[in-house]
Amino acid sequence: MMKNKIKIALCQMDIDPDFNKNVSNAIDMINKAAQKGAKIVMLPEIFISPYDVRRFKKIAINDKDPLIKTFSELSLKKKMMIVAGSVVERSGRNLYNTSFIFEKGRLIGKYRKTHLFDVDIKGKITFQESSVFKPGNIAKTFNTSFGKIGVVICFDLRFPEMVRSLAKQGAKMIFAPAAFSHITGPLHWELIVRARAMDSQSFVFACSPALNKKYSYQAWGHSAIVDPYGVVVNMLGFKSGILCEEINLNLVEKVRKEIPIL
């Protein structure tokens, strides 16, 4: 029987240049989230590396990588669903920004980022994900023991129709591993995560890396849990940490009945 009250944990990681250290840190934070009673845990976008397109080809994995087995086994051992942020996935000659989802000891699905982060804010930030990644092309839900969920990645959040389509497919929870920059974060981060929760009438969970001023690309942090009214349940600051809150999915039905916009 599906439970309506669920404890969710977002792991705002300090990202290290070393792949293995990041994996170890992710596992440690997942274990700590389990100790807090979390049943679903999420990692940030590209949690295995600093966000730098020059590094991505070197750290790419496929769905046969030992990392997949590690998280599959961890989901079974800790009795949790793991939304494993995103990694660089290699498929043939192509690279994708991909989120893998694990539950009950197995990989239950993956989502490839659809809208790639190609921006040029003069004098502030220029970034072109499409120089490395191919876009995904399917916005779909995943069936879990907690009901249907939707997954989007970072820049996807700027497209309300995509998030609304997941809600229309039955998702009550939207998971968004992300890494808004220190330029776009203060402008739009809270505004966007609240807006997507409001216009999809879903819980939105947005998980970022912690701020690290040593890197050329500096993530904004501020991982957040937002309810279907668009109200921030809780939000972290710049530093690493685990945001853990219990949510009640009954609120989704309540909001959708009160204000029927879907």
Tell what function each PLM region has.
Residues 90-169, 182-191, 257-261:
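Active-site catalytic loop in hydrolytic enzyme cores
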Residues 63-83, 148, 157-243:
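CN hydrolase (nitrilase-like) catalytic-core segments centered on the catalytic cysteine
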Residues 84-86, 98-101, 140-142, 223-225, ...:
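Short beta-strand scaffold segments in enzyme catalytic cores
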Residues 19, 27-104, 110, 119, ...:
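Cys-nucleophile CN-hydrolase/nitrilase-fold catalytic domain and related Cys-dependent amidase chemistry
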Residues 13, 87, 113-114, 154, ...:
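Active-site beta-loop-alpha junctions enriched in small/polar residues
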Residues 11, 59, 111, 142, ...:
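Hydrophobic residues at beta-strand termini and immediately following loops
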Residues 8, 101-108, 226-234:
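Short, glycine-anchored, charge-dense loop/turn motifs used at functional sites
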